[in-house]
């Protein structure tokens, strides 16, 4: 089954907690802190795979979790990093943030990958918090939470040539004649319900051809699921309009105008692509008597054309020569851009601009907006007196207390920092943690 859209949830691994431990060695009566750091949580990575052609798997499994980092251990042993989770998708998959609609990545090359959720950093062990005045720290950091988000996946086929036409124009028969594809073929409209891909092998060039399900008037408004299909030709280099010469209801010229109109209304850029008109089914008597009239119209149209019979194989080589010619020209005219295999860095972490801390009022609560301070608060057990003392010194050094004063926070008012609620003490110009 061909599925080209999916929604999934991804959760990166949490970082492991730092360890509180002390040296317990013979002949070392006063061993210092020896708590190891927690391991980093695994990232969630999406990777393009040219051997896949559908998003069907994501309709059966929607939730994906990377491994968490191990906790630190005594003797300064660092916890093991969590294993990254690699999710494979077909090449041509676009990844969107489901909440914001932001395009995260467009995976157009085999092996191309992007980090969609980053694992949390491991917490620091108590070794990091030893000072001349705090020689035996009884606290460590908890690991950071891994990122989590919902994603929309959308597949747009990567093909060099797109076959477009009204229902029952003979596109599937043509695809089966020129490529290795084996689409369903039947003498009635809408046999093709999903796009089919085929590979055409010529003497010194290989290119892909996509058979797009039949379009009807109103396709750009998703009539006959046209909107679902039209996006699959957005990436093609060349369009071949397959037109039934024997159709007595919709003459070739009218069929061509319908197709042009639907493509234009969906995206005017589609008509900027090179076009070839393939007049099909010329072996049928109904078509034979109309050929002079059709040829007269085509000469005035000024678009390359060829009369074919996909069923009987008539003039298929001529059509392939035209396809090859335009594919070559288009590929030569498009500058070669080296595609980054890694769209975002994986291990080093992202580069973030330094944010300016601020204190804002929301109803009866003040809230500190400062990622660094919020992150540190969430990593520490602030009900531990030593940890709270360390945090209090940190917010003074970072200028958070001065910021609170400038915001005119009154004595006894509550301030939220990370997951904790504090009360401001104006007399001591400090924060007191609430139970």
Curated annotation (Swiss-Prot):
Gene3D superfamilies per record: GTP-binding protein OBG, C-terminal domain (3.30.300.350), GTP1/OBG domain (2.70.210.12), P-loop containing nucleotide triphosphate hydrolases (3.40.50.300)
Alphabetical list of InterPro entries matching this protein: G_OBG, GTP-bd, GTP-bd_Obg/CgtA, GTP-bd_prot_GTP1/OBG_C_sf, GTP1_OBG_dom, GTP1_OBG_dom_sf, OBG_GTPase, OCT_dom
Domain Obg, residue spans: 1-158
EC number: 3.6.5.-
Binding residues annotated for GTP, in chain numbering: 165-172, 190-194, 211-214, 280-283, 309-311
EC supergroup of this enzyme: hydrolase
Residues annotated as binding Mg(2+): 172, 192
Listed CDD domains: Obg
Coiled-coil residues: none
Pfam families according to UniProt: DUF1967 (PF09269), GTP1_OBG (PF01018), MMR_HSR1 (PF01926)
UniProt domain OCT: residue ranges: 343-426
Cofactor section: Mg(2+)
GO biological process: ribosome biogenesis
GO annotations of cellular component type: cytoplasm
GO MF annotation list: GTP binding; GTPase activity; magnesium ion binding
Compartments reported by the entry: Cytoplasm
Residue ranges of domain OBG-type G in the record: 159-328
Main location: cytoplasm
UniProt keyword list: Cytoplasm, GTP-binding, Hydrolase, Magnesium, Metal-binding, Nucleotide-binding
Entry similarity comment: Belongs to the TRAFAC class OBG-HflX-like GTPase superfamily. OBG GTPase family.
PANTHER family reported in the protein's UniProt record: DEVELOPMENTALLY REGULATED GTP-BINDING PROTEIN-RELATED, MITOCHONDRIAL RIBOSOME-ASSOCIATED GTPASE 2
Subunit structure: Monomer.
Main function: An essential GTPase which binds GTP, GDP and possibly (p)ppGpp with moderate affinity, with high nucleotide exchange rates and a fairly low GTP hydrolysis rate. Plays a role in control of the cell cycle, stress response, ribosome biogenesis and in those bacteria that undergo differentiation, in morphogenesis control.
Record protein name field: GTPase Obg
Gene field: obg
């Amino acid at each position: 089954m061909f599925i080209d859209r999916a929604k999934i949830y991804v959760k990166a691994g949490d970082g492991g907690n730092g360890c509180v431990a002390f040296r317990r060695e013979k002949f070392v009566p006063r061993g210092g802190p020896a708590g190891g750091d927690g391991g980093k949580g695994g990232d969630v990575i999406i990777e393009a795979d040219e051997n896949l052609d559908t998003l069907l798997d994501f309709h059966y499994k929607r939730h994906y979790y990377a491994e968490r980092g191990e906790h630190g251990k005594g003797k300064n042993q660092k916890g093991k990093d969590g294993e990254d989770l690699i999710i494979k998708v077909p090449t041509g998959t676009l990844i969107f943030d489901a909440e914001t609609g932001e395009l995260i990545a467009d995976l157009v090359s085999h092996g191309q990958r992007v980090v969609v959720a980053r694992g949390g950093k491991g917490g620091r062990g108590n070794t990091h918090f030893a000072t001349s005045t705090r020689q035996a720290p009884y606290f460590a950091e908890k690991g950071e939470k891994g990122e989590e988000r919902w994603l929309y996946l959308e597949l747009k086929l990567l093909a060099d040539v797109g076959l477009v036409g009204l229902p029952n124009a003979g596109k599937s028969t043509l695809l089966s004649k020129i490529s290795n594809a084996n689409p369903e073929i039947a003498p009635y409209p809408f046999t093709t319900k999903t796009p089919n891909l085929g590979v055409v092998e010529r003497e010194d060039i290989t290119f892909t051809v996509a058979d797009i399900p039949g379009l009807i008037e109103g396709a750009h408004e998703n009539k006959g699921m046209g909107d679902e299909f039209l996006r699959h030709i957005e990436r093609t280099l060349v369009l071949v309009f397959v037109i039934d010469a024997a159709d007595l209801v919709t003459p070739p010229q009218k069929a061509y105008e319908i197709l042009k109109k639907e493509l234009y209304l969906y995206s005017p850029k589609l008509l900027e692509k090179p076009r070839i008109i393939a007049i099909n089914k010329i072996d049928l008597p109904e078509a034979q008597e109309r050929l002079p009239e059709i040829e007269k119209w085509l000469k005035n149209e000024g678009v390359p054309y060829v009369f074919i019979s996909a069923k009987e194989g008539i003039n298929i080589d001529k059509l392939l020569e035209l396809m090859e010619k335009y594919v070559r020209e288009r590929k030569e005219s498009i500058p070669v851009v080296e595609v980054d295999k890694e769209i975002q860095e994986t291990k080093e972490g992202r580069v973030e601009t330094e944010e300016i801390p601020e204190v804002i009022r929301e109803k009866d609560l003040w809230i500190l907006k400062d990622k660094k301070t919020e992150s540190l608060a969430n990593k520490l057990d602030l009900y531990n007196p030593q940890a709270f003392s360390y945090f209090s010194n940190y917010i003074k050094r970072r200028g958070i207390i001065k910021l609170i004063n400038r915001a005119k926070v009154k004595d006894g008012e509550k301030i939220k920092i990370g997951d904790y609620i504090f009360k401001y003490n104006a007399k001591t110009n400090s924060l007191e943690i609430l139970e």
